[in-house]
Amino acid sequence: MTVIDEQEALKRRLAELKTEHRDLDIAIDALINSGNYNNLQLQRLKKRKLVLKDYIFLTENALLPDIIA
């Protein structure tokens, strides 16, 4: 796999992560607005959303070139 292929794979993965993060945000809002949820269910969704945020951060950093100042 070339560097360009790796970059493209990272970009695709980043798009997938952002989509899943956005979908979880919508799901959490819908769950809260429904008023019919338990706290454990909500906590699991929020934890998953935080994990995705970390993966997004790591993937974005992997896409940035290393610049030595």
Regions found by a protein language model. Name each.
Residues 8-69:
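Amphipathic, hydrophobic secondary-structure cores in small proteins
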